[in-house]
Amino acid sequence: MTLLFAQTAWLVPLYPLVASLLSLLWSPGVISRTGPRPCGYINLLMGTLAFVHSAVALVALHSNSTAGSSAIYRPLTFGWTWLDTAGLRIGFDGLITEPALVAMTVITGLHVLVQIYSIAYLEMDWGWPRFFGSLSFFEAGLCALVLT
């Protein structure tokens, strides 16, 4: 079951990306009845999900690599082809390795801590959607950069 988390570790950058897109709903004029606070809590929830997914994937990949020595040298790969025509291939390829998952776990863990601190620090501020959307978009970019 936990190996499934390692095989789907490419989904980890999508959690903060979805959170940053959901933050747009709390932009001024779209949702004004609830105020900006739910935006921060949704970003914290999605960041925590990304952290848990990357931590479980790291544990699963580490226990899989210690099961056999040949598994260490075979990282999980994924790819997505956007355009493939006349010898031109434009796509997105990535490797899920143990160092990449360690870096992604550190990134998402620090992001959760920054989110908790920011919720307390920005208590009376109305700029939550812009701040938390930018923060989650930055985290999604860092996690995607680690995987490629």
Can you name each region flagged by the protein language model?
Residues 98-99, 146-148:
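Transmembrane helix interruption/hinge and helix-loop junction motifs
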